[in-house]
């Protein structure tokens, strides 16, 4: 007895038929061969009756009705760049959620070490990752058209039996001479999801494709953290550089043996990666359903469970300068006790090279500031440094006193301090925090962007 399913497209839906047949019920034509020593009979199958166990007509809405993403996400054309552990899981989840227009970029083939923590199977070994993911998507979504999947990256064998990568894509040749080609290649996509973990790739996309919504997913060693960085909060490359530098990672113990994309590569099992990746996709879906790209978020495993540390963005009044600070950093600031002189603590962080983006990574109490700064300065390899003061205002909300102003001016003029434009964070009587930047001889207020 043999069973199989047959799907036939019918009026916008797929008519699924569950069929079975029995070999003994077939009609055969016997062909005789005289081999001198004995006769050999071969039976040629002429017909085989198929019996139906059931027929069900399912359209696309019914097929994905139990678990589809919002329509506002599903209609987007997604450019998925990087198909390793993270990227393959993203592709798998997008396919199960009804995303049907997708471009795929990668230059690797599937190797044995990839299987344990990705969407690939043993049947994909030796194939290009792009080809394998395209096949997986088609196997999940019967409504997808071949033209809806754009494959960028394949491996072929030449006449000398050498494996050669075939691509005209920007992926395998990241440089700024081909920016125009890259923009053309990404033309028509509504959302770029970068899963490469590559600084070069994110830098390239952040500048070459800044007019397209960008989500960059990057996982740390042991999958303790997943950074989901979006260009809703500014330049993704600068954001990831700052907030990845804040995380104290295990930079010594990487996986060295076996086959995989990189050697060394990070430790992390399938469950840990999938949990964080799907949390990020869940947040992305909910925000897109509300017609907005999600704020950058750092998902971390902690003693409290999984923490979603969301980045808030402020804009400086009258200037093209933005400020980023995470919710966990603001919680830390709330826990710092008031001081009689109003001098509560200090702000650490990073200025982008063009000076248009300021990223706060720490707000710490004055007593422990020196030791903490020494530690984070070393952890970030000099990227994170002092950038401002944190003070308590006994005055009206959203204001500062003369003493706070004088201290900030003194810091700006102190050549031993590595900033001419220090921040002032003021804790208001209700516990909220207002941020100011010293610029052109005055303290200018930042306004929160929704």
Regions from the language model: what does each represent?
Residues 1-76, 434:
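Glycine/serine-rich phosphate-binding loop and adjoining beta1-alpha1 elements at the start
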Residues 1-28, 32, 172-175, 190-288, ...:
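E1/E1-like adenylate-forming module used to activate ubiquitin-like modifiers
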Residues 40-60, 291-328, 333:
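Phosphate-binding loop/pocket of nucleotide- and phosphate-handling active sites
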Residues 68-109:
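Glycine-rich adenosine-cofactor-binding loop
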Residues 77, 190-191, 213, 385-388:
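Structural motif
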Residues 107-145:
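Glycine-rich phosphate-binding loop and adjoining beta1-alpha1-beta2 segment
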Residues 134-189, 196-199:
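A structured beta-alpha segment of the ubiquitous adenosine-cofactor-binding alpha/beta core
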Residues 311-385, 394-450:
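Conserved beta-strand-loop surface patch within small alpha/beta domains used
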